[in-house]
From Swiss-Prot:
Identification of the protein by name: Exostosin-2
Ligand binding (UDP): L461, R465, N490, N517, D538, D539
GO molecular function, one term: glucuronosyltransferase activity
Subunit structure, interactors included: Part of the heparan sulfate polymerase, a dimeric complex composed of EXT1 and EXT2. Could also form homooligomeric complexes. Interacts with NDST1. Interacts with GALNT5.
GO cellular component terms listed in the entry, alphabetical order: catalytic complex; endoplasmic reticulum; endoplasmic reticulum membrane; extracellular space; Golgi apparatus; Golgi membrane; membrane
Lumenal side: 47-718
Keyword Kinase: no
C-alpha cells in the first residue's frame, strides 16, 4: 500500500517531463521532413545544371550559362578519318541493343563553350542551321536523354561550315566528349567541307571512326555504307515563295545560274549559248544592282536582270556544275523549281544516293562531255522529262526543303543499316505519296523476316453447304496462327444462317455477301483481309488437320511469294492432240496446287481482280471453272517460280458429299480444265507453270520418334 502511494505521489512529477521530451522529438522529426520536402521541391523547380542532357538549345542559353571548357595545347587529337571504316568494322551495333520499335536512340551532348589555351573560341557561335538540326533530332522519336540507352551520339559542336572552325582545336574538343571512344557511334554533320586552296571534299577535322554526314563527298573520300552524303542546305530556296509549276516544256531548254565558275566552264557555256541561241540561257552575277536589292536574289544575262530562284522555273533543264566545292546549294534551288538538274561534277556522290534513285530525277553528264550536253538532253523522251520534273520537285519536298528533313533522312538511313529487316523500301524512299497511295506493295520485295502482324486470314467460299461449312470453320479455327475467318457467301437466293447458329470460335468471323455468284469472288481484295497471308479453302475441305494447316503456313512464311498448298496437279503436253492436258492422277511431278486449300500473299488478290491479262477473269466467271488454275498461272507468271506442295495428302474428296454437290465431279467440268490451260497459255503468250518433283514435309515426318516431341505430329494420311 505504501509503495502504491509513493508511486502515485511521484507519478505526476515525471509525466510532464516525458511529454516534453516526446514533443521535442516529434517536432524535430517533423521539421526535418518538412525541410526535406521543401528542398526536393526547390530542386524540382530550380533551373538544372547545364549538364542536363536535354537542355542544349542555344535558344535557352546565354553566354553566361554555357560552361567554359579550356583545352590545353597538348590535349589529345583524334586520328585522321579511317577510310577503311564500314558498319561492320567501326560501328558498335551492340550499343543499339534490342528495340521492339526498330528505332535507334540518339543522344545529344550538352552545350559547352570550348576555348583554346589562350582563351580563343574553337568555333563561332552555334549557327541557326545547326540549332535547327539539333532541335529536329530532339523532337524526333530517335532522341533519348539517357546516355546509357544511346546508340548514336551527336556533339553540340557546330561543324556545318569548316570555314568557321579551328581544325586542330575542334578535334581536341571532340576527343574531350565523355563517350568519344575513338569516335565510335558518333555522328558529325558538315555541309561545307575543306578550305582554300585545296577545298577537300570531306571535313578536315580529325575524327577517327566517327560517321560523317557530309555535303560534297567525292568517291575518293566517301566511305560507302558508312558515311551519309547529305545536301548543301539552301536557305534561299527554303525561304522564297515558289509556287509549283506543272511539268512540260518551258521557255528555256537549258539554263545555267551559277556564279564564280571556273573560266573553262564559262567558255563551254558561252559556246553552248552561241550554238543554240535562245534555247540556252547562261546567267552570272549582276554588276549594277539597285541599292537594297540582295545580290543573291538576282542573276543577270548581259544587261537583263532575272529574279532568282524564280528564273529556274523557266527552264526544262538546269545545270549544276562543280564549284570550289563539289556540293552546291544550287542543286536544292533547281529541285525546288521543278527543273531537271544536269549534274556535271565528276566523282560527286549525290545526296542520299544510298537510297534515292537519282536517275529518276536528274541527268549526270561527265565533264568531258559538257560540249555535247545539249544533244544528250534532246535524246530524252518528253514523257520521261515530265516524270523527272515531278520527281525533282518531290525530292526537294521530301529531303531538301529544311534542315529537319535532312537530319531525319540521315538518321533513317543509319537506322535502316542497323535494322535492315525493318528498312524503308525503295518505293517508300522514291515514290511520291500520290504514287504510293495508288499502288499495292509488291510481295517480291518483302522484309527479311515475316511481318510483325503474324497469322493468316482464312477465306472460305461457300454456296449452300452449311453443314460442311461449319465443320471447316471448326477445324480451321483450331490452327494456332489463324487471325481471322472470312466466309464469302456466294448464294444470292438464300440468306446465310442466323448469327446464333454459327460455330463459336476464338477469332473474328466475318460473312461477306456477294452481288453475283462468281468463282472470282474468292480472290477479291476485301478490306477485311488485314494479314499478309491468305488461306483459300473450299467449304468441303474437312479432312485437313490443324497440324497440316499450321505446317503449310510455316512453309509459306519461308516462301511468301509462292503458292503453298495441298492438292497437287500437273499440266502435260498431249503429243497426239498437240495441246496441253490437265492431269489429276498421282504422278512424280506437280506444277499446280489448287486453291481449294492453299496459302498465298494477299497481293495476288489485287492482281487477280485488277491486273489479270486478257479476258481470263470473265471467262472463269462465265464457265464457273478454273479460277484456281488462273491463279496458278498468274503467280507463276509474276514470280517465275514453282508452287510448293506440302504434306503427303492426295485425297481431298469429301466423303459425305454427293455427286451433285461438287463442281469438280462433273465430267464436263474436268474436260474444261484442259481447255482452261490452253486458253490461259494463249492469253499469257507462254506457259508460265513450272514443274517440280518435290514437296515439303516436316523434318521428323515418318521418323521413329515419339509423336509428342514432334512439332507437327498429326500430318494425316494420304
Amino acid at each position: 500500500m505504501c509503495a502504491s502511494v509513493k508511486y502515485n505521489i511521484r507519478g505526476p512529477a515525471l509525466i510532464p517531463r516525458m511529454k516534453t521530451k516526446h514533443r521535442i522529438y516529434y517536432i524535430t522529426l517533423f521539421s526535418i521532413v518538412l525541410l526535406g520536402l521543401i528542398a526536393t521541391g526547390m530542386f524540382q523547380f530550380w533551373p538544372h545544371s547545364i549538364e542536363s542532357s536535354g537542355d542544349w538549345s542555344v535558344e535557352k542559353r546565354t553566354g553566361r550559362d554555357v560552361p567554359l571548357v579550356r583545352l590545353p595545347a597538348d590535349s589529345p587529337v583524334p586520328e585522321r578519318g579511317d577510310l577503311s571504316c564500314r558498319m561492320h568494322t567501326c560501328f558498335d551495333v551492340y550499343r543499339c541493343g534490342f528495340n521492339p520499335k526498330n528505332k535507334i536512340k540518339v543522344y545529344i551532348y550538352p552545350l559547352k563553350k570550348y576555348v583554346g589555351e589562350a582563351g580563343v573560341p574553337v568555333s563561332s557561335t552555334i549557327s541557326r542551321e545547326y540549332n535547327e538540326l539539333l532541335t529536329a533530332i530532339s523532337d524526333s522519336d530517335y532522341y533519348t536523354d539517357d546516355v546509357t540507352r544511346a546508340c548514336l551520339f551527336v556533339p553540340s559542336i557546330d561543324l556545318l561550315n569548316q570555314n568557321s572552325l579551328r581544325v586542330k582545336e575542334t578535334a581536341q574538343a571532340l576527343a574531350q566528349l565523355s563517350r568519344w571512344d575513338r569516335g565510335t557511334n558518333h555522328l558529325l554533320f558538315n555541309m561545307l567541307p575543306g578550305g582554300p586552296p585545296d577545298y577537300n571534299t570531306a571535313l578536315d577535322v580529325p575524327r577517327d571512326r566517327a560517321l560523317l554526314a557530309g555535303g560534297g563527298f567525292s568517291t575518293w573520300t566517301y566511305r560507302q555504307g558508312y558515311d551519309v552524303s547529305i545536301p548543301v542546305y539552301s536557305p534561299l530556296s527554303a525561304e522564297v515563295d515558289l509556287p509549283e509549276k506543272g511539268p512540260g516544256p518551258r521557255r528555256y531548254f537549258l539554263l545555267s545560274s551559277q556564279v564564280a565558275l571556273h573560266p573553262e566552264y564559262r567558255e563551254d557555256l558561252a559556246a553552248l549559248q552561241a550554238r543554240h541561241g535562245e534555247a540556252v540561257l547562261v546567267l552570272d552575277k549582276c554588276s549594277n544592282l539597285s541599292e537594297g536589292v540582295p545580290a543573291a536574289r538576282r542573276r543577270c544575262h548581259q544587261q537583263q536582270a532575272f529574279d532568282y530562284p524564280q528564273v529556274l522555273q523557266e527552264a526544262t533543264f538546269c545545270m549544276v556544275l562543280r564549284g570550289a566545292r563539289l556540293g552546291q546549294a544550287v542543286l536544292s534551288d533547281v529541285l525546288r523549281a521543278g527543273c531537271v538538274p544536269v549534274i556535271i561534277a565528276d566523282s560527286y556522290v549525290l545526296p542520299f544516293s544510298e537510297v534515292l534513285d537519282w536517275k529518276r530525277a536528274s541527268v549526270v553528264v561527265p565533264e568531258e562531255k559538257m560540249s555535247d550536253v545539249y544533244s544528250i538532253l534532246q535524246s530524252i523522251p518528253r514523257r520521261q522529262i515530265e516524270e523527272m520534273q515531278r520527281q525533282a520537285r518531290w525530292f526537294w519536298e521530301a529531303y531538301f526543303q529544311s534542315i529537319k528533313a535532312i537530319a531525319l533522312a540521315t538518321l533513317q538511313i543509319i537506322n535502316d543499316r542497323i535494322y535492315p529487316y525493318a528498312a524503308i523500301s525503295y518505293e517508300d524512299w522514291n515514290d511520291p505519296p500520290a504514287v504510293k497511295w495508288g499502288s499495292v506493295s509488291n510481295p517480291l520485295f518483302l522484309p527479311l523476316i515475316p511481318p510483325q502482324s503474324q497469322g493468316f486470314t482464312a477465306i472460305v467460299l461457300t454456296y449452300d453447304r452449311v453443314e460442311s461449312l461449319f465443320r471447316v470453320i471448326t477445324e480451321v479455327s483450331k490452327v494456332p496462327s489463324l487471325s481471322k475467318l472470312l466466309v464469302v457467301w456466294n448464294n444470292q437466293n438464300k440468306n446465310p444462317p442466323e448469327d446464333s447458329l454459327w460455330p463459336k470460335i476464338r477469332v473474328p468471323l466475318k460473312v461477306v455477301r456477294t452481288a453475283e455468284n462468281k468463282l472470282s469472288n474468292r480472290f477479291f481484295p476485301y478490306d477485311e483481309i488485314e494479314t499478309e497471308a491468305v488461306l483459300a479453302i473450299d467449304d468441303d475441305i474437312i479432312m485437313l488437320t490443324s497440324d497440316e494447316l499450321q505446317f503449310g503456313y510455316e512453309v509459306w512464311r519461308e516462301f511468301p511469294d509462292r503458292l503453298v498448298g495441298y492438292p497437287g496437279r500437273l499440266h502435260l503436253w498431249d503429243h497426239e492432240m498437240n495441246k496441253w492436258k490437265y492431269e489429276s492422277e498421282w504422278t512424280n511431278e506437280v506444277s499446280m496446287v489448287l486453291t481449294g486449300a492453299a496459302f498465298y500473299h494477299k497481293y495476288f488478290n489485287y492482281l487477280y481482280t485488277y491486273k489479270m491479262p486478257g479476258d481470263i477473269k470473265n471467262w472463269v466467271d462465265a464457265h464457273m471453272n478454273c479460277e484456281d488454275i488462273a491463279m496458278n498461272f498468274l503467280v507463276a507468271n509474276v514470280t517465275g517460280k514453282a508452287v510448293i506442295k506440302v504434306t503427303p495428302r492426295k485425297k481431298f474428296k469429301c466423303p459425305e458429299c454427293t455427286a451433285i454437290d461438287g463442281l469438280s465431279l462433273d465430267q464436263t467440268h474436268m474436260v474444261e480444265r484442259s481447255e482452261c490451260i490452253n486458253k490461259f497459255a494463249s492469253v499469257f503468250g507462254t506457259m508460265p507453270l513450272k514443274v517440280v518433283e518435290h514437296r515439303a514435309d516436316p523434318v521428323l515426318y515418318k521418323d521413329d520418334f515419339p509423336e509428342k516431341l514432334k512439332s507437327f505430329p498429326n500430318i494425316g494420311s494420304l
